[in-house]
Amino acid sequence: MRYIVVTGGVMSGLGKGITAASIGRLLMNKGYRVTAIKIDPYINIDAGLMSPFQHGEVYVLKDGGEVDLDLGNYERFLDIELTRDHNITTGKVYSTVIEKERRGEYLGKTVQIIPHITDEIKRRIRQVSRTGGSEICLIEVGGTVGDIESMPFLEAMRQLKYEESGNIFFVHVTLAPMTSDGEQKTKPTQHSVKEMRELGLQPDMIVVRCKKPLLPETKAKIAHFCDVPIEAVISGHDSDDIYRVPLQLEAEGLTKYIMKAMRLFPLEERRDWYDLVQRMDSIREKVSMALVGKYTSGSQCTDPMKDAYLSIREALKHAGIEAGVMPEISWIDAEDLERIQPEKVLRDFDGILVPGGFGARGTEGKMNAIRYAREKGIPYLGICFGMQLAVIEFARNVCGLEGASSTEFGETPHPVIALLPEQEKVRQMGATMRLGNYPAHLIEGTLAHRIYGTTEIVERHRHRYEVNPAYIEVLEKNGLLFSGRNGDLMEIMEIPGHPFFFACQFHPEMRSRPGRPSPPFLAFVEAMKAQRLRRTGSTYTLELTA
């Protein structure tokens, strides 16, 4: 087993995850089996209870693990499926060590950071890295070198370096800020590497984030002061799309240097990623789409395009590449649609998407958008909460069930959405939802069946509430169809006769991959293409820049 450890310096948010995923993709292109581990130094057990305002989306793995969004990038770039064990947190490590101490497994020893915490970190890394027949394991250490939270993990990496001598490679991601006169400053990188050395670690390669490509003199200066060959100073300049980053790093000589340093030889030359980017570059048409959510604006909100709805954005991109038309997303604050007529906001869009979410805030605005899509024949895709609200909207405005709602929001005369039976006695919030992969059976001849091309599917879930079985008959009697089911659980709803009205209780975006888009997202993009042609007679033309 060979390990590639990716650390970060200067500041957080430099793109360590994309750098690590890109390295993995490049090594996959050479024929190697690659896996990935994300270390998160926070004390939380997992990301399940973290606010999207602070942390971005919670990504769900096949086994129900609720993890950092970087693991979604690993799955998409490497086309693999990870487990909750691929996400190591301070909370998990300390919980395990404390449980062992309580069971008497340390035989009366004083339990300390070194060796007990660091040994547990290394045990987890070795155990996970050897599953699935992988040959190379990427390890991204979250946070920034120098953070107190990261110290035990960096010490574990130092120990691993000597225990796995010759089979471990350190990549340090730093920043070269640019002054107003265009000078690239190297001092932050120098100080970051100095701090890393004080912990007993020396980077084998430095990937320098910068606005424009690193100048030769900047590379030479970093190489001189940080004790790495100039070939190991890689320009990580800004790219307009994350899927170009592997090719950019390849052009910088990153793959060649890592393979030489780790005594690796090309086993094959895969071109599928190059072909993907070429297909993406060839797209000249676009469609317009409204994403109506609650994490799209406000002083607390991070950039929604990157964080809270990341997997949805990527799934739309995958579908767009396949369909030959790129969705242009407009981020609509659901609360705005509680004050403004939907017609004024939504009339020029080719499709409307309501994503997953929790809580009552913004729900009326979302349902106003759903009603507009249903009544005006605009393609609609609802995900998780977006399906529940579509059912509530239909119950109120088509079935005449006044006050129909979800028990999540309080008392209601018509609880068309209710708590799952197995959730009724649950009191602890963390890791207690219906999480991970579950199957569904699709009815032949339905839109769902046409989209998937099969009657049996598996998708990822993250929810506590479901359609109340007591209301299924009245809903279907009035024209709604539940075309996908798992026993008594309704997984997919559609409205026959509508150009495209599809909503699902699961999260199809989390199984979408570049070159293998999620079927519902691909169908949605195709429906938007048709809507654009009906509405204007043509699709938009992308504005190309030199």
Swiss-Prot record:
CTPSs have evolved a hybrid strategy for distinguishing between UTP and CTP. The overlapping regions of the product feedback inhibitory and substrate sites recognize a common feature in both compounds, the triphosphate moiety. To differentiate isosteric substrate and product pyrimidine rings, an additional pocket far from the expected kinase/ligase catalytic site, specifically recognizes the cytosine and ribose portions of the product inhibitor. Belongs to the CTP synthase family. GO terms for biological process: 'de novo' CTP biosynthetic process; pyrimidine nucleobase biosynthetic process. The keyword Nucleotide-binding applies. ATP binds at residues 13-18, 70. Catalyzes the ATP-dependent amination of UTP to CTP with either L-glutamine or ammonia as the source of nitrogen. Regulates intracellular CTP levels through interactions with the four ribonucleotide triphosphates. Mg(2+) binds at residues 70, 140. PROSITE patterns: GATASE_TYPE_1 (PS51273). The keyword ATP-binding applies. Pfam families: CTP_synth_N, GATase. Residues 1-264 are annotated as: Amidoligase domain. The active site is at residues 384, 507, 509. The lineage of its organism: Archaea, Methanobacteriati, Methanobacteriota, Stenosarchaea group, Methanomicrobia. It is an enzyme of class 6 (ligase). NCBIfam families: PRK05380.1, PyrG. SUPFAM superfamilies: Class I glutamine amidotransferase-like (SSF52317), P-loop containing nucleoside triphosphate hydrolases (SSF52540). It comes from the Archaea. Allosterically activated by GTP, when glutamine is the substrate; GTP has no effect on the reaction when ammonia is the substrate. The allosteric effector GTP functions by stabilizing the protein conformation that binds the tetrahedral intermediate(s) formed during glutamine hydrolysis. Inhibited by the product CTP, via allosteric rather than competitive inhibition. Signal peptide: none annotated. CTP binds at residues 12, 147-149, 185-190, 221. L-glutamine binds at residues 357, 385-388, 408, 464. This is CTP synthase. Homotetramer. Its EC number is 6.3.4.2. It catalyses: UTP + L-glutamine + ATP + H2O = CTP + L-glutamate + ADP + phosphate + 2 H(+); L-glutamine + H2O = L-glutamate + NH4(+); UTP + NH4(+) + ATP = CTP + ADP + phosphate + 2 H(+).
